[in-house]
């Protein structure tokens, strides 16, 4: 019997890293550089699990064509896959706030997942330092996760920190305080990525797995890969 409190990622290694899958009732932050598979990850979790998906697309990164490709490659009904996703496209930080607030009334028992991709795009584009606004939006998402019993994935961008010489997540402390589970994606080589578990409610931090990006979406990397 499937554990309905966990959503599979479709990647055995990622599911094991996360203690069985993406948990309902909490916020999972996924961050990393461009083209490391963050959006594909969020889409795949929505595709492979029962329930509708509220997908807040702030960057125009959600691709119906890509979702259709993933569904078709897995022999899933493409039309049903597309119908599962309810897309919102806020054009600035204020619209993002309004959309997230509306989700409190929109998300019901038919939904299993909420995605904000990416959570910090407008914040970054507007050169904002309003950490309080992001914190308020995260509080709403926390409420939705708990009260509506859905999983919430917030995709985050990175910036180069000249002091430490490493890439860090935007609004690191604000998101770090509100997100219980944190995954970092990194590029290894063409098509192959690494997922690092930076924090988890009960899993040891620092664990990592390899995965690859294919027509199906994200897949486990086998030894011969």
Swiss-Prot record:
Keywords for the protein's UniProt record, in alphabetical order: ATP-binding, DNA damage, DNA recombination, DNA-binding, Nucleotide-binding
Domain of life from the UniProt record: Archaea
SUPFAM superfamilies linked to this entry: P-loop containing nucleoside triphosphate hydrolases
PROSITE patterns: RECA_2
InterPro entries reported for this sequence: AAA+_ATPase, DNA_recomb/repair_Rad51_C, DNA_repair_and_recomb_RadB, P-loop_NTPase, RecA_ATP-bd
Job description of the protein: Involved in DNA repair and in homologous recombination. May regulate the cleavage reactions of the branch-structured DNA. Has a very weak ATPase activity that is not stimulated by DNA. Binds DNA but does not promote DNA strands exchange.
Protein name (record): DNA repair and recombination protein RadB
Organism: Pyrococcus furiosus (strain ATCC 43587 / DSM 3638 / JCM 8422 / Vc1)
Gene: radB
